[in-house]
Amino acid sequence: MLQTYLQSIMNQSHLTYDEVESVTNLMLNGADPHQIAAFLAVLKYRGETPTEVAGMISALQKQATPVNLPFPALDIVGTGGDLANTVNISTGSAILAAACGIPIAKHGNRSVSSQSGSADVLEALGIEIEMSPEELLSCVQEVGIGFMFAPIYHPSLKKLAPIRKGMKFPSVFNILGPLLNPANTEYALIGVSNEPILELMSEVCLKFKNTKRTFLFHGSGLDELTTLGKVVGYDIQQGKKTRLEIDPTSLGFNSCKIEDLKGGNSKLNACILKKAFMGQQSAIADALIFNAGAAMWVFGNAATLEEGIHSARKTLMEGEALRVLAQWAAFSQQLKLKRGSCN
């Protein structure tokens, strides 16, 4: 059956919403791995449509474990796939944003195309990443931040993980990941690895995602907000999208080089983030401030991006991100111990 849909996209046909839901269900339920890899490769080469991406999101969300948060929250996440091997900027930024008072429900996974995914670096920072929905809620309420490990909340995707890793290049799942937050956060900062995907995802968010506000962006070849160069993006809210171009130097940042943002394995990245949290000035610290400031602006805790950046910088320099990290690590490990004692 998957062969039929594969032939269709090879002939440059576009699939309907219902058809791509069926395709996704086939991939999750025992389709031939070679056909799955071929389908993903051809779809990537041909280019996904907003309707196709939305249909896949629908199929995956129906099989996900939902998280019901009784309050607004935000996620900071990227598509990955920029192959730049930078430090885990979105993960560090999420911790700083939580220190700025924004409830963070972060969704993430282990590395697929880099040396260190969000789950990997959080483990290296002492965080217990395997949380039930109830434990996740407790974390966000107590600390201001919690992490949803993708294999727990999207168990159906485990079957596709070896195929994705074996492909060695980004697929539609890089687009899907940031849009599959199990808590369906009302607010999001989403980094995108290239501008064509930025256009695609902006249409998906505008037409199919029910969020209050999303800031989608691409920054000089990265799926991160950094001071490397110009940032282009869309502010999506109230059924409209507004295109933005941001020059980081106009916000008081110094320009950096890609080498200034490089990371390595999870232990190295954890060390780099801790140094930034301790107030060590660097391009990485600037990136964390940039992202957390944008989060404050998107969430409505700052009237402008400039105001958000000012507040985020002050919060970082006061050591609040380091305090939140320590509190999160301690509380998550307490939850793990409590879980073990009940078994």
UniProtKB/Swiss-Prot annotation:
One of its GO terms (cellular component) is cytosol. Belongs to the anthranilate phosphoribosyltransferase family. This is Anthranilate phosphoribosyltransferase. Its EC number is 2.4.2.18. Homodimer. Anthranilate 1 binds at G78, N109. Transmembrane segments: none annotated. Pfam families: Glycos_trans_3N, Glycos_transf_3. GO terms for molecular function: anthranilate phosphoribosyltransferase activity; magnesium ion binding. The lineage of its organism: Bacteria, Pseudomonadati, Chlamydiota, Chlamydiia, Chlamydiales. Binds 2 magnesium ions per monomer. Signal peptide: none annotated. It catalyses: N-(5-phospho-beta-D-ribosyl)anthranilate + diphosphate = 5-phospho-alpha-D-ribose 1-diphosphate + anthranilate. Mg(2+) 2 binds at D223, E224. GO terms for biological process: L-tryptophan biosynthetic process. Its cofactor is Mg(2+). Keywords: Amino-acid biosynthesis, Aromatic amino acid biosynthesis, Glycosyltransferase, Magnesium, Metal-binding, Transferase, Tryptophan biosynthesis. Pathway: Amino-acid biosynthesis; L-tryptophan biosynthesis; L-tryptophan from chorismate: step 2/5. Catalyzes the transfer of the phosphoribosyl group of 5-phosphorylribose-1-pyrophosphate (PRPP) to anthranilate to yield N-(5'-phosphoribosyl)-anthranilate (PRA). Mg(2+) 1 binds at S90, E224. It comes from Chlamydia caviae (strain ATCC VR-813 / DSM 19441 / 03DC25 / GPIC).
